[in-house]
C-alpha cells in the first residue's frame, strides 16, 4: 500500500480527529483508493532524485505516495485548516516535505525554490507537478513548466464512476 490514508475509513478518521469535513465549496475530494495512487505514481515515473510540486495535498494521501518515490515534495494548499493535518500525517517525511499555504494560482517560482531549499534532501533530478482535483485543469498555476520551475507536469483529474 502506497498510503495508509487511501481508504474511506482512514480518511474519515483523520478528518474527524481534526474536527474537519469535506469543503465542497473548495472543490475538495479525497483520494481513497490505493490503486489510483499507484497509477498516478506509475505515470509520473518518479525516482529519489525528483522534486515534486503538488497542488492541493488535502490530508496527505497522495503526498505520502509521492514521498515514498521522490526526493522532495512541496505542496501548495489554500485551505487554512489543513496544515495542522499535514503536519501530523506527514511527520515521518518532515525533512523532505515543505508546505506553501496559499492559492496555487498566486504561486511564484521563487516560493517553490525557497520551499525546496528548506528540505534536507538535495535533488538533481527533474521536477514534477501533481495538480489536485480542486483546481480547474484549464486554469494556470503561477509556477509552470514554461518557467523552468518544473520540467514535467502531471495532472490528476477527477475520477468518477
Language-model features: where?
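Catalytic cores of RNA-modifying enzymes
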Residues: 1-127, 136, 140, 145-161
Amino acid at each position: 500500500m502506497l498510503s495508509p490514508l487511501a481508504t474511506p475509513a482512514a480518511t474519515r478518521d483523520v478528518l474527524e480527529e481534526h474536527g474537519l469535513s469535506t469543503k465542497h465549496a473548495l472543490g475538495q475530494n479525497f483520494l481513497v483508493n490505493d490503486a489510483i495512487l499507484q497509477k498516478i505514481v506509475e505515470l509520473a515515473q518518479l525516482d529519489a532524485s525528483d522534486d515534486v510540486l503538488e497542488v492541493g495535498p488535502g490530508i496527505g494521501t497522495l503526498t505520502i505516495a509521492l514521498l515514498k518515490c521522490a526526493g522532495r515534495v512541496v505542496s501548495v494548499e489554500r485551505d487554512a485548516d489543513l496544515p495542522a493535518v499535514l503536519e501530523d500525517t506527514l511527520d515521518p517525511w518532515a525533512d523532505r516535505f515543505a508546505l506553501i499555504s496559499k492559492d496555487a494560482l498566486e504561486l511564484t517560482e521563487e516560493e517553490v525554490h525557497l520551499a525546496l531549499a528548506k528540505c534536507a534532501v538535495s535533488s538533481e533530478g527533474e521536477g514534477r507537478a501533481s495538480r489536485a482535483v480542486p483546481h480547474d485543469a484549464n486554469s494556470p498555476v503561477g509556477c509552470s513548466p514554461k518557467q523552468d520551475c518544473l520540467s514535467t507536469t502531471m495532472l490528476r483529474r477527477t475520477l468518477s464512476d
